[in-house]
């Protein structure tokens, strides 16, 4: 969860997790919690253009998971970058930190805000513009990331107090310009149009 302070705050809100040492990560049943599947889609899209090697961030050998009585096995709601990372780089041993999934609507909303903020931080890693689909990324963010988190971000960056992610704000997070993202969108549209044209010619 980052620093000790945020870990302490997190545990205060969501309870201290039980620690399980997992020696066979492949055998453990972890699925994305359905309430958080939209945020997971945002991560999957962002991973396509990720240039930063996550192993350089010295990932701690742990993963936060949640036990929800409505679902079998463990579910995951946040820190999806590490779930994706450990799924691709199977660890020999990993500590699985098991929280009880909140049954209270306000706590679930709070967890969505936490997961949304984590995703926004993840976007500030280095991404390869040539592998990014800005329009798709923007629409996924506006569909699934907490609008309150986006509103706070717009205010922080002196943009209009909107609850949606503009291309301008997305560019700011990705450390590039709006023009670069517009150009990338045009390139993608042109490629798509070329494919459609070819299909029409062959039909």
Model-found features: residue ranges?
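Generic surface-pattern signal
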Residues: 15, 55-59, 116, 146, ...
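Exposed alpha-helical structural elements
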Residues: 45-49, 110, 136, 169
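Short, charged/polar connector segments at secondary-structure boundaries
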Residues: 1-97
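Amphipathic, charge-rich alpha-helical segments that serve as recognition/docking helices
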Residues: 94-163
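Short alpha-helical "recognition helix" segments of helix-turn-helix
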Residues: 166-172
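Short, solvent-exposed alpha-helical "recognition" segments
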Residues: 157-161, 179-202
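Short, flexible active-site loop motifs that bind/organize anionic cofactors or intermediates
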Residues: 75, 160, 171
